[in-house]
Amino acid sequence: MTVAGGATVQAAGHSAGRGRNPNRPPKMVLGTQRRASDVATLQYFKRHGVERVVGYPPSPPLSEGRGYWLASEVAQTKEFIESQGLEMEMATLPFLGSTLVDRDDRPAIMLGQSPERDRDIEDIHKCIQACAEVGVTSVKYNMSLLGVLSTDRVPGRGGSSLRQFRAADLDYSLPDTIAGKVDADTYWERIDYFLERVVPVAEEYKVRIACHPQDPGTPPGGYRGVEENVLSVPGGKGLFKFLKMHSSAYHGLNLCVGTLAEMLWNPADEIYDILRRLGRTKRIFNIHLRNIIGRRDDFVESWPDEGIVDHARIINILAEEGYADAIDPDHIPRHDDDPTREQGYAHGYGFILGAINGAEHRGNGRS
């Protein structure tokens, strides 16, 4: 198969480009999903122990009639990241983000609108093909209608500011989204339509597609016309249902540990067993690590070391289940003295790196 311009596409496992060193045993690594637009940012990542960086190829020029990446654009992004001794194995699709559907430039897939969604799905096929040609082995995306819901920011330690979500404080006077009334069955039908058409292409080109669960789950009775954020229902049941749909080694999760905690009524007890079961599927392709204080419908995001989820235990479980991809810090708290959050993310990088090293020592029988 070819992409625009006639370039022949190879499967990612047999492609040109540097990518992962085939002689290095697979293992967990410290990653980041933070966007890097200059060498200084890449060097900041490298200094703090990051090995793998999620890439953001240029947004396709829709005004010129092209809605997908060219392989040359993905290659340029990959080469830029690799120039500082880092790896790019995952790219963020140019649409299907964690955006309120009303603000989305390309909402047709989530609205179930044909033929527009078929055009957008074809563009995703071409993005997957472009990644395969240059050795990018994964892409990540969301299936979001409501975007990331928050209700306030509250004070945290050292004068930091923390994201809060309380279902009771949502503004229930807001109208439905442009999607109108969407019950759970309809939401699943739209996800199924997407997976049915994209998973075979992911398999053909050996590029893994990784979906982030909706953040957070919807309150009882739904919100703004959406009955249920279906991947984020209590007990993690939506995640297992999602993985069973069009089951494939190339269809999986960009699993956010914080979002998983947010969908549970008793996260401090429930999360470890659910994570182990998900780990055994071998369908987690990336991890976002954040912590919370609270439970479903009422939580505050915290610093990674002070929440109710034991992140060292999380990383030990991932190691025990053979997880061998990146772990990225996520939603680090804000502070006025740290407008770019470089201080906060440095804390996150160090915390994760220490936990990974601890898990490796534990696995090697060292104390």
Each model region followed by its residue ranges:
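Structural motif corresponding to the early beta-alpha repeats
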Residues: S59-D192, E196, E203-E204
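Non-cysteine beta-strand/loop elements that form the S-adenosyl-L-methionine
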Residues: E51-P57, A91-L93, Y141, C211, ...
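A short acidic (Asp/Glu
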Residues: L42, R66, T151, G221-G222, ...
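Short, flexible loop segments at the rims of nucleotide/cofactor-binding pockets, characterized by
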Residues: L30-Q33, R117-D118, V230-L231
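Active-site-proximal loop/turn and secondary-structure-junction residues that shape catalytic pockets
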Residues: R34-S37, S59, P94-G97, M143-G147, ...
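A diffuse structural propensity rather than consistent per-protein peaks
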Residues: D38, L70, D183, I308-D310
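Histidine-acidic metal/acid-base catalytic patches
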Residues: V3-K27, E82-S83, V101-D104, M110, ...
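Ligand-binding pocket scaffold of soluble enzyme catalytic domains
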Residues: R20-R66, S72-E73, E79-M88, T92-L93, ...
